[in-house]
């Protein structure tokens, strides 16, 4: 499988057909309609992007890296959660062909904050259908079997849930709200609930109705579909869209600040190639090591060795060459999780804990506030942090500082 995806973290650069732009659904209620979501134009953490299929027959290739347990669960999800209750026909494949809609992999991708994600490589066959949604073949489903995420793969029920969930993203199904309420106020039982290990293993009737009511258009595959260039994002951590994250987005700023191991004011001074994870297939995941110069600690604490500089790891889902596309942020507030904390929580050996303690990641994929010429800038879907966007950066820092007290 190719790794020239400009990352979908959505990585996908959409091929513009007749100037159409993929539609975006909004709202946090349950039972969201089928849609593609976000262009996938930057290597972020991790690439995640929802696309729709281009027909009612959905071909899924099982890569040799897929564990036996995940293969069994994915096979069951295809049959019991999708083929039987919907108008879709699910087809298992042992290799990738021109008909392949999704390819499933599993590997230890490192502690990047997500147990699974879906993305569409930029060089995969793709386009925009008459409904304005991006369709994509050969989408990649990645299950991260790093020990930190063992709870998502610990038993048949957990694997059944996560495979049903990620498969739904390849068809355009989106996360339900948190809690996953239906329009009548009830709680929906669906595998499309976000961040719920060992959650439901089937679709809600809303999901089934949306699949059955959507026109998955069969459109010609362009001879070449590199996509049109998209302007770089100021914030690469955009939306938590098609990932199964381990750290749920807190509902209040105080909860978010207190959940971080450290909240620091600082800037990225250097980005260099870092560690490499993944040996089960031929697409290893490279990381960038970003040097974060710490100006002050706003909340939490840092060990003595990291009080002036620390290493922030950034996954390079578009391959090692995409390190050149990463921004070197100016002054910003970073909400951080030390990877040693995660290693300790899952009971890794002391020597592994010590090794992982040298690295940090973002608490959530939107845990960043940038000083944009004196104004605070956040991702639109940064939860409590988004309320700081547009204020003076100085005022935003003060609010964060007070929230941690």
Predicted feature locations:
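OB-fold (S1/OB) nucleic-acid-binding surfaces
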Residues: 278-314
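Metzincin-family zinc-dependent endopeptidase catalytic domain
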Residues: 71-182
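Disordered inhibitory propeptide/activation segment of secreted metzincin zinc metalloprotease zymogens
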Residues: 17-69, 220
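Netrin-like (NTR/C345C) domain of secreted extracellular proteins
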Residues: 222-240, 283, 317-405
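Metalloprotease/metallohydrolase-associated module, dominated by Zn2+-dependent proteases
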Residues: 28, 139-141, 148, 158, ...
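Conserved hydrophobic positions within beta-strands
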Residues: 266-268
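Secretory targeting and sorting signals
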Residues: 1-27, 228
């Amino acid at each position: 499988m190719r790794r020239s995806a400009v990352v979908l973290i959505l990585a996908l650069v959409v091929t513009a057909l007749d100037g159409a732009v993929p539609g975006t659904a909004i709202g946090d209620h349950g039972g969201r309609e089928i849609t593609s979501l976000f262009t996938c134009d930057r290597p972020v953490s991790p690439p995640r992007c929802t696309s729709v299929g281009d027909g009612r027959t959905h071909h899924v290739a099982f890569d040799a890296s897929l564990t036996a347990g995940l293969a069994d669960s994915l096979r069951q999800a295809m049959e019991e959660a999708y083929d039987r209750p919907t108008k879709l026909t699910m087809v298992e494949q042992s290799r990738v062909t021109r008909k392949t809609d999704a390819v499933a992999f599993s590997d230890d991708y490192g502690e990047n904050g997500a147990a699974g994600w879906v993305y569409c490589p930029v060089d995969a066959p793709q386009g925009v259908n008459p409904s304005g949604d991006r369709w994509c073949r050969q989408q990649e489903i990645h299950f991260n079997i790093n020990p930190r995420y063992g709870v998502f793969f610990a038993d048949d029920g957990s694997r059944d849930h996560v495979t049903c969930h990620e498969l739904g993203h390849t068809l355009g199904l989106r996360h339900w709200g948190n809690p996953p309420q239906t329009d009548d106020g009830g709680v929906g039982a669906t595998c499309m609930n976000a961040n719920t290990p060992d959650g439901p293993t089937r679709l809600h009737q809303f999901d089934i109705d949306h699949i059955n009511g959507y026109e998955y258009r069969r459109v010609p595959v362009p001879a070449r579909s590199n996509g049109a260039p998209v302007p770089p994002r100021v914030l690469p951590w955009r939306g938590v869209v098609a990932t199964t994250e381990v750290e749920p987005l807190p509902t209040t700023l105080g909860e978010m600040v207190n959940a971080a191991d450290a909240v620091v004011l600082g800037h990225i001074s250097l980005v260099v190639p870092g560690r490499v994870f993944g040996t089960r297939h031929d697409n290893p995941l490279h990381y960038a090591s970003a040097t974060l110069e710490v100006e002050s600690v706003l909340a939490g604490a840092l060990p003595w060795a990291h009080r002036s500089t620390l290493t922030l790891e950034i996954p390079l889902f578009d391959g090692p060459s995409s390190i050149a596309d990463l921004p070197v942020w100016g002054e910003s507030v970073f909400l951080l999780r030390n990877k040693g904390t995660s290693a300790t929580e899952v009971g890794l050996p002391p020597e592994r804990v010590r090794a992982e303690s040298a690295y940090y990641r973002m608490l959530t994929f939107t845990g960043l506030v940038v000083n944009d010429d004196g104004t605070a800038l956040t991702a639109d879907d940064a939860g409590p942090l988004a309320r700081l966007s547009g204020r003076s950066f100085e005022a935003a820092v003060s609010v964060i500082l007070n929230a941690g007290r």
